[in-house]
Amino acid sequence: MPAQYIRIKGARVHNLKNVDVEIPRDKLVVFTGLSGSGKSSLAFDTLYAEGHRRFVESLSSYARQFLGQMDKPDLDFIDGLSPAISIDQKTTSKNPRSTVGTVTEIYDYLRLLYARIGIPHCPVCGKEIRKMSTDTMIDQIMELPEGTKFMMMAPVVSAKKGLHEKVFDDARKGGYARVRVDGFLYPLDEVPTLDKAKKHSIDVVVDRLVMKPDIRRRLSDSLETTLALGNGIAVIETTDGGEMRFSQNYACEEHGIGMTELSPRMFSFNSPFGACPKCAGMGEKQVVAEFKVIPDRSLSLRGGAIAVNGFKTMEEESWNGPLIEAVGKDYGFTLDTPIKDYTKEGLHALLYGTGSKKYHITRFFGGFGRESLASWNGILNIIESRLTQAGGEYYNEFMDFTPCPECGGKRLSPEILAVTVGGLNIYELCSLNVTSALRFFEELKLTQTEETIAKEILKEIRARLGFLQSVGLDYLTLWRKSGSLSGGEAQRIRLATQIGSALVGVMYILDEPSIGLHQRDNSKLIDTLCRLRDTGNTVIVVEHDEETMMASDYIVDIGPGAGIHGGEVVAAGTPEDIMKNESSLTGAYLSGRKKIPVPEKRREGNGAYLTIKGARENNLKNVDVDIPLGKFVCVTGVSGSGKSSLVNSILLNELSRKLNRAHTFPGKFDSIEGIENLDKVVSIDQSPIGRTPRSNPATYTGLFTDIRELFAMTPDAKARGYTAGRFSFNVKGGRCEMCEGDGVRCIEMHFLPDVYVTCDTCHGKRYNQDTLEVKYKGKSIFDVLDMTVEEGLQFFSSMPKLARKLQTLYDVGLGYVKIGQSSTTLSGGEAQRVKLATELSKRGTGKTIYILDEPTTGLHSDDVAKLLTVLNRLCENGNTVLVIEHNLDVIKTADHIIDLGPEGGDGGGTVVCTGTPEEVAMCERSYTGKYLKPLLSKTEI
């Protein structure tokens, strides 16, 4: 009898405190708890790690070295495990060739469909291509001028690897004397040995002829032989290098354009048989972007209009200044003329050069003038020429991608784009969103023969499109690049792909699949998770969404606090059991005993506005948006409605450029008014505060510098001549040199995971003995870094500068975090709160705008309450907080809502409504308003 439970005993990974738990198999199980309580440690670092490790250990040691080996979790016992599949928040491939269609494998089925029932057309006239008769071929060949010498060849190998010795033997046996190999003609006895690792093309020369009026009979015989040998294809090459291809398979009778039998690889933009020859299937080419080189056209050349090194100064002693000044005399501009005032010809000369014309100029070096003749190649051409030189990587930031001029971004060759199914070519079909594509296949009319051929293919395509729709991704197109997807979108795509694979008996572990999903689409996601469970799988979800928890079979609540205060199973059972449990914080929110209150009144703001005009990035439809300043503002809308395009691509990038002098490039818009009311923009996301174990909350907030300076002021340090640098574990001097200040040493185990052992010299304290002997209030630098924020607050209570920074960390709910805790061990929510604390500790001007993209990711309802307290503190100081959010608890507390939509993708990109939560709740067109209404009491609406 199969096991009914997954049993874990003595789990001690990270902050887990000897956890024992039983998880029912073949059920939908939710792990929940505060950010940093140990949910991910139990789900991913224990359950998934052990499930994956056991699978990998069943393989040979040779195979294991090619697979990601996971550490053995620190636990006593675990059984009832199934093979584990993790579907986490990491974005999909950044490979520019990867698309939604290829990741979901729908594109593979589409290629098969087009190869089997696609109708070819002539790419020139658009007429349907039919098979070419032998007489038609002969008529076209007979049109060659009299006296033309030509060869008739049969292609027998087309771009295939190998030595192809049998091909040459068969040609000899057939009585043929010559072959063309990779474009070169050889007698059969002198063919070189081919490289079997390279692709080769081989044509057998069937006949060599001279065009005469009486040649038709011989031509007919030779052509029939050639077509038989070349599987219906014949190639004619004239002595001047001209070539004609004929096909018994498909060819346009009017233009003579022939095609081989359709095959799936011809529809792949990753194959030379189908890819656009100009861009090799990329659909775009990299060029120097004018808008990146000259980001602000209101500036002059002398004022720093050109953002590229080497062109920023235009003084007499600069290399380019005198030359551009000479060009300007011809085209009516000076070094002090704003770029926006240049004539069209003048701007073209500046950017693209003046050809071969020479200018007589004087360059000054060290006060001495040197005369010379020089030509001007143009800024863009100069940058392009430097790309391939040493140090050319610098110029990559000034490059941009533009659609390929040959295929217009369609990635495929014209012949392949001329093949249609249901009147659409494969690019046009992939450019439809998921809903439209599904409708296309449901309405597709086929002949009985086509239906028989395509039945199974269409079944798979419809099912996979349906899965994408069921996880709330109906607005995506199959042509969308994978690298442009958000973490939540990428995760739901992988979820849809897993459903398509129809595996049974697997343990799926998902990390907050509801991220980035509007409440409207949440029920679809829950249905999908239930479908995965009902096919015979165990589905474990790390989640904070109340709707998902209520739909689950079993909840494991981890806590009671976070970090050192967490790591225990507070409650486990059905949603009803959790709601009744008095010690469960999750139960308190689920049952309504605790809730985030609606503010009694909304802020009035300072009366100023930030106005975005003509926003057109991605799917935004030329919208104008007013953002009130001095308020807590929420941008809402279904997935794909244009929130990130408006806030991140346009507003954040433009404000960063104008206020922070950042080198950013905003999306398409006309203007932003009201920037003069702000002096700084701060983006606070959930990315790690550092990528190495050496970074920690103390280094990020600047607290470590203050602590080191404090230790350098102690009598002991002064007596020994120690400076603040002595107390850094990042530089030589005070650190332990055996572990270079890491506190641990890494021992490589090759096909086993690397082992980290505590340094036996400093015993994990990171500093050498001399440094540790320096004490402040009886504590060494290591002792201070090992304190929690809570302990540090008491210890440094007499030091206002340190206490203020520690107090803000404590206020955002990070009292349990150690001052020197490695940043790599912090969750996304914890990293975000460290950033918020850093901002809170600064003395603000009240003219800052804080931009946050889904700040509640990974946060429990209780964490959300703390986050809202911090965000409101920022607003109380006169600042503006702008968040993109789906969490209704955050939306209901906002002062102002900007709701985009109404749908995602093409159906979005407009402003549905704006106003207070009460006003939005009354809007009939707003999906956000519909779900917001029940949360606001009737007296408030």
Task: Describe each region flagged by the PLM.
Residues 1-941:
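Conserved phosphate-binding elements of NTP-dependent enzyme cores
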